[in-house]
Amino acid sequence: MDRRKLIFGKFWLFGLLNNVLYVVILAAAVDIVGPTLPKSLILLADILPSFLVKLVAPFFIDRVEYHYRIWSLIALSGFGMLLVASGRLGVCIVGIVLASISSGVGEITFLQLTHYFSHVALNGWSSGTGGAGLAGSFLYMLLTSILKIPVSRSLLLFSILPIGFLLYFTLQVERTAYEPLASGHFMEAEDNSGSVISLEAPRTTVDNARDCASRPRLAALRERIEVTMRRLKVLVVPYMIPLSTVYLFEYLINQGVSPTLMFPIHEGYGTSQLFHKYRDIYVAYGTLYQLGVFISRSSGSWVRIRGLYLLSVLQFLNLVILLIQSWYYVIHSVWVIMAIVLYEGLLGGASYVNSFLNISEDVPLAEREFSLGAVSISDSSGTLVAAFIGILLEPVLCSHQVKTGRPWCQLE
């Protein structure tokens, strides 16, 4: 097999494996907490540990060898899913936290690994993370809603997936050709066309530490923080705010509003043959959302959107429409709501891919690597805020529905 295709395939699998459990856990939120507790509790447990890992990892992650990280991914995510499958809420939350830590470490690890290969590795990783959303939500719907496999057994099956990270060890031979040399020297690497080019190796942490050794540590730290803040400041308005707000609105929909977008299930109603339980509707919403995300994340090469704030406005309108639906029940067709959820996913995926494409095209080369890494935390921050708001929002919506004769949000 062509080496470039092989690398693409391996990193595609790494992206899939690293993100699929995050998606499965969100899809299973209604089954983990039941109909009476807010689903945003699961979103919070699923995103907060990963978010914290991304914040602190730059200070220590370079000291941890890759093979140790891979074994930690397998242990954390595998054991975490075993706990999630236990069926006890407290134990499930602990398992979700472990899986979330694994996801955060995995994202940092594999993004760093792409440095040792041509750009095809980064393309494979990005595509795999998009595929994880669709695969995870669809597989969970297939196992629980269609095949009727019990939730605990379905979640137990997913605990096997982290073993696939062992594929990393087949990269060792390939990686040696891209090992960085000491600062000031040169190494050979492949560009996107497969030809060999000469690149100066990046400065190492040791090099930077030596530069700071002659200055007081506190002064050096203060200077570094000031420089970093200046670099971040120019990214906030054009990239970080629109991306974070899109994710804020869409995850408010997914975890705060969607659990209340229920319809009656009985003979003579259009949903009776498609859905057997109310939780099936919620799982279907998740699958459609991930389908939209996958489609739009894969369309960046032929559909380009420069106005990122337009996507934020459109996603906000989706939130408003679905809030009105949850409160007043103005739309009596589940198909219309499913179409809106699919459209919501399209907007979310488009915001993600176009944000980073815009950075790649607009930001100077010297700042591009930093900018891509810095802006990547925007989606997590928006999701995190949505989790806190959703914990309060869903009970309010569901309580109002029960009072107005629509108790479906409390039923299984």
From Swiss-Prot:
The keyword Transport applies. GO terms for biological process: L-arginine transmembrane transport; lysine transport; regulation of intracellular pH. It is a multi-pass membrane protein. It comes from the Eukaryota. Keywords: Amino-acid transport, Membrane, Signal, Transmembrane, Transmembrane helix, Transport, Vacuole. Residues 1-29 form the signal peptide. InterPro entries: Battenin_disease_Cln3, Battenin_disease_Cln3_subgr, MFS_trans_sf. One of its GO terms (cellular component) is vacuolar membrane. Belongs to the battenin family. Involved in vacuolar transport and vacuole pH homeostasis. Also required for cytokinesis. This is Protein BTN1. The gene is BTN1.
